[in-house]
From Swiss-Prot:
Ranges annotated as biased composition (Polar residues): 74-87
CDD domains: GAL4
Name of protein: Cercosporin biosynthesis regulatory protein CTB8
Coiled-coil residues: none
Disruption phenotype: Blocks the expression of the cercosporin cluster and abolishes the production of cercosporin.
Species assigned in the record: Cercospora nicotianae (Barn spot disease fungus)
Pfam families in UniProt: AflR, Zn_clus
Role, per record: Transcription regulator of the gene cluster that mediates the biosynthesis of cercosporin, a light-activated, non-host-selective toxin. The perylenequinone chromophore of cercosporin absorbs light energy to attain an electronically-activated triplet state and produces active oxygen species such as the hydroxyl radical, superoxide, hydrogen peroxide or singlet oxygen upon reaction with oxygen molecules. These reactive oxygen species cause damage to various cellular components including lipids, proteins and nucleic acids.
PROSITE patterns: ZN2_CY6_FUNGAL_1, ZN2_CY6_FUNGAL_2
Keyword Metal-binding annotated: yes
DNA-binding region, residue intervals: 26-53
Length: 397
């Protein structure tokens, strides 16, 4: 009797309850799509960077938003669905993953596109760039610029009103969208990070060479008429060449004797403006099925999310996200450094004036060079505002 009672006793333990599965990678490593060392309670990367390391539940929470699909997907009964419905290697262009789309893979599929991600304005006045960023992949996250700038007496007060005083999203240096090359070419690197001569012409030769590589000659130019045309470039190639060019230009600014030379700074401003013009052209890529403009300089093959072909609007939005991310990661830090160096150069030219005839002539030359640099700053600011306007237009749809 006792045996029967023991066998028939109800099981008070709820077998339908399953303990939530904890993700193997921490939140920060997962959001940056990098390998986590998985130490508990905090991984080595978060400890080194002073970040709050958290291991979240892998189950998706909340109600999944409807996404527009050609065919409905069958319902799934998997209880431990991963947080991201899109594996990193599922985003590809032309049958393989495109490095340019890996920024887009940070987002949780098309349904996670939200207008709130675009509400971070961009600083367009290069005189007022303050290197502080908001991370729109980490809500509420705020970090200061890793490179200290308090040693320079530069006013970084943000403008109000029409200057859109704000920031691009932060991307960790370890989560570069492409295989990262050295920040400076071997021909420019030496002990102490000092740039050495390149091609016999030094830093100014390197800056002018970068300008030449990014420049597109006019079809009406009689000298360039017989040269082979490379005006049309792939979207991926534009991002690769711009990233490499900006890294080389940044290394020139680390050269003590050249970073204050006004001729070198003028060449740097010209090269930076050419790089920005390619970002602008990358935002003008015609979508699938749309006619290609004769003046278009950038083309992009169809993009896929897994086996799903993205529509024209989704591709345009994805390209804008990638351009926006690279502007923050490579362009804006270089622009801030260039602004500081040019301001210090102008300040040094004014403080070195004396009453001698030779110094007066030198001062006049420095003043003329400063005026040229100021013109370049205004032109660069107008070009940056144009890129921001294009991104805003894409955001509004």
């Amino acid at each position: 009797m006792a045996k029967g009672s023991a066998g028939d006793a109800p099981n008070t333990r709820d077998t339908s309850f399953k303990r939530p599965k904890i993700r193997e990678s921490c939140t920060h490593c997962s959001s940056q799509k990098i390998r986590c060392t998985k130490e508990r309670p905090a991984c080595a990367r978060c400890v080194n960077k002073g970040l709050l390391c958290q291991y979240n539940i892998s189950r998706r929470t909340g109600t999944r938003r409807h996404s527009v699909r050609a065919t409905p997907e069958p319902e799934t009964t998997i209880s431990n669905a991963p947080t991201s419905s899109v594996p990193p290697d599922s985003v590809k262009i032309d049958g393989k993953q495109s490095p340019a789309m890996s920024d887009f893979a940070l987002l949780d599929g098309l349904e996670t596109f939200n207008n709130s991600l675009w509400h971070q304005p961009i600083t367009t006045d290069i005189q007022d760039i303050d290197m502080q960023y908001f991370d729109f992949f980490d809500p509420g996250g705020y970090q200061a610029e890793p490179e200290p700038i308090n040693s320079f007496d530069i006013d970084s007060t943000l403008l109000c009103g029409t200057s859109t005083a704000g920031y691009l999203p932060e991307l960790d240096a370890e989560a570069s969208t492409r295989p990262s090359s050295s920040s400076s070419p071997p021909s420019q690197r030496s002990d102490g990070g000092r740039a050495t001569t390149h091609g016999g012409g030094g830093c100014i030769s390197t800056a002018l060479q970068i300008f030449s590589e990014l420049h597109v000659s006019s079809s009406a130019c009689p000298i360039a008429a017989g040269a082979p045309s490379h005006n049309i470039r792939e979207f991926d190639h534009v991002l690769d060449s711009n990233r490499a060019a900006l890294e080389k230009l940044s290394s020139i600014l680390d050269c003590p004797p050249c970073c204050h030379d006004q001729e070198v700074l003028t060449a740097l401003f010209l090269a930076v403006q050419k790089a920005l013009s390619w970002y602008s052209a990358a935002l003008d890529v015609a979508g699938d099925g749309e006619p290609t403009s004769p003046s278009s300089r950038v083309k992009s093959p169809p993009a896929f999310l897994g086996s799903y072909a993205l529509g024209a609007q989704a591709q345009t939005l994805a390209r804008a996200y990638v351009v926006m991310a690279q502007l923050q990661q490579h362009f804006q830090p270089l622009l801030a450094k260039l602004q500081r160096k040019s301001s210090l150069s102008a300040l040094g030219a004014r403080s070195s004036s004396t009453t001698s005839l030779s110094s007066v002539s030198s001062l006049q030359s420095s003043t003329s060079g400063s005026a040229v640099i100021e013109c370049q700053k205004r032109a660069l600011q107008e070009a940056l505002e144009d890129v921001v306007a294009k991104i805003e237009g894409i955001k509004r749809g």
